[in-house]
Swiss-Prot record:
Top EC group: ligase
Keywords, alphabetical: ATP-binding, Ligase, Nucleotide-binding, Protein biosynthesis
EC numbers: 6.3.5.7
Domain of life, per lineage: Bacteria
PANTHER family linked: GLUTAMYL-TRNA(GLN) AMIDOTRANSFERASE SUBUNIT A, TRANSAMIDASE
GO molecular function: ATP binding; glutaminyl-tRNA synthase (glutamine-hydrolyzing) activity
Name listed for the protein in its UniProt record: Glutamyl-tRNA(Gln) amidotransferase subunit A
The keyword Ligase is annotated on this UniProt entry: yes
GO BP field: translation
Entry's family note: Belongs to the amidase family. GatA subfamily.
């Protein structure tokens, strides 16, 4: 098999045996990019020169007999809303087309420290607002399983890169499903860790109480290794949880006997595609055969998650995005009459339609006459949704649902129907409102398109999710499936 198709732990074994070099892996990934990038379009910026320098440094360590970490020399792609010092960071927006950060995000620094090789910055929905990567200010990204379909979003470039062999691992961000939904649509593993477990320092903010950085990987073992690298307290992030470091590989036991898993009936309702439902039921059957006790449960406030999310997230976005004014960095329209006109023109030309729509929604819900009726009420609903999860986890080790109600849809199919697009995240949004961890892993193909299964867990209990996901993966073939491009 080609090097670009292997997992990080398989490549690590070959590296430590000196059967391949880190530079071999990097070259294999860039050769793959040359083959398929014109079709998939995962990237906004490639960093080949820096990548080759880093790969050679890893090879020098190996030659000197130094021990290397499990992810040393492994190519990783970074979503373009994480600051990378000296490397353009655009958030896929025209308003940041020329922004080069003077510092790197903590997660990026941790990746560098682990001797991973950054391949480039991936495409996304502008400012992480969207579910298809069609809202990018630069170009569309295509699903490697069917180039006429979307990869999901907002981290569509990161998911597509891993699925297409253009990176071994990638980082994305998840505000309402932006890691898990594209992971499901592209047939890879994606995780949104607990809010506060991974530093947000250097992540360009969309909705600060919901945003969370997380990985895309080929399998669950790689996921555990990446979490070992990126999780942990960061004094630069005031919302970072001060927890002791966990070795997540200890949870890869292939044993779920006696575990209790709940399936909320609200997540299996009418909007779920029948083929998706069929694959989820097959996975439930497999988990039962492996010794888990799986039963239906109820999360009564689920229906209110979507409206609450689109009030809270847009309110926070309207505040966060006020900083893009043409004065300090990014796009500045020169032919303005005065300062106010420059603000208006820079923002109206720099932001895309979806970003403008969400800024207007958020500004409206925060305005004096509507604050109590909308924003405050949404915060109360958020509390009710969190209480639903708290009650469920008194009884269950984890909850299970589809990740996305459908498989990947055609490019352009939902562009003119924002409500239909928003409903793509109906199964993922409640997790962000509650701040808990969730993982999406492949559970089969429907019409040769991947279907994703979501596991949701207690806050800071990523280990249980990895344990269940690893057991399911070890007893099925789904994470070993690769698209033909």
């Amino acid at each position: 098999m080609d090097l670009f198709q292997l997992t990080a732990h398989q490549l690590h074994q070959l590296l430590t045996k000196k059967e391949i070099s880190a530079l071999d892996i990097t070259e294999a990934v860039y050769n793959r990019i040359e083959q398929v990038e014109d079709k998939v379009k995962s990237y906004l910026t490639l960093t080949r020169e820096q990548a080759e320098i880093k790969a050679r440094q890893v090879d020098q360590k190996i030659a000197a007999g130094e021990s290397i970490g499990p992810l040393a020399g492994i190519p990783i792609a970074i979503k373009d809303n994480m600051c990378t010092q000296g490397i353009r960071t655009t958030c896929a927006s025209k308003i940041l087309y020329n922004f080069v950060p003077p510092y790197s995000a903590t997660s990026v620094e941790k990746v560098y420290t682990a001797d991973m090789v950054m391949v480039g910055k991936t495409n996304m929905d502008e400012f992480a607002m969207g579910s298809s990567t069609e809202n990018s200010g630069f170009h569309l990204t295509h699903n490697p399983w069917d180039l006429d379909r979307v990869p999901g979003g907002s981290s569509g470039g990161s998911a597509a890169a891993v699925a297409a062999g253009e990176a071994i691992i990638s980082l994305g961000s998840d505000t309402g499903g932006s890691i898990r939904q594209p992971a499901a649509l592209c047939g890879v593993v994606g995780m949104k860790p607990t809010y506060g477990s991974v530093s947000r320092y250097g992540l360009v903010a969309y909705a600060s109480s919901l945003d969370q950085i997380g990985p895309f990987t080929r399998d669950v073992t790689d996921m555990a290794h990446v979490l070992n690298v990126i999780c942990g307290h960061d004094p630069m992030d005031s919302t970072s949880a001060n927890l002791k470091q966990t070795d997540y590989t200890q949870f890869l036991t292939n044993d779920i006997k006696g575990m209790k898993i709940g399936v909320p009936r609200e997540y299996m309702a009418d909007g779920i595609d029948p083929q998706v439902r069929e694959k989820i039921k097959a996975a439930i059957q497999k988990l039962t055969e492996l010794g888990a006790h799986v039963e239906e449960t109820s999360m009564p406030h689920t229906d209110y998650a979507m409206p609450a999310y689109y009030l809270i997230a847009t309110a926070e976005a309207s505040s966060n995005l006020a900083r893009y004014d043409g004065v300090r960095y990014g796009l500045r329209v020169e032919e303005a009459r005065d300062l106010v006109d420059m603000f208006m023109r820079s923002r109206s030309q720099g932001f895309g339609d979806e970003v403008k729509r969400r800024i207007m929604l958020g500004t409206y819900s925060l305005s004096a006459g509507y604050y109590d009726a909308y924003y405050l009420k949404a915060l109360k609903v958020r509390t009710l949704i969190k209480q639903d999860f708290d009650r469920a986890f008194e009884k269950y080790d984890a909850l299970l649902s589809p990740t996305s109600p459908t498989t990947a849809f055609k490019i352009g199919e939902m562009v003119n129907d924002p409500i239909q697009m928003y409903l793509q995240d109906v199964c993922t949004i409640p997790v962000n409102l509650a701040g808990i961890p969730a993982i999406s892993l492949p559970c089969g193909l429907a019409n040769n398109l991947p279907v994703g299964l979501q596991l949701m867990g207690k806050a800071f209990d990523e280990g249980t999710l990895l344990r269940i996901a690893y057991t399911l993966e070890q007893n099925t073939e789904y994470t070993r499936l690769r698209p033909e491009i």
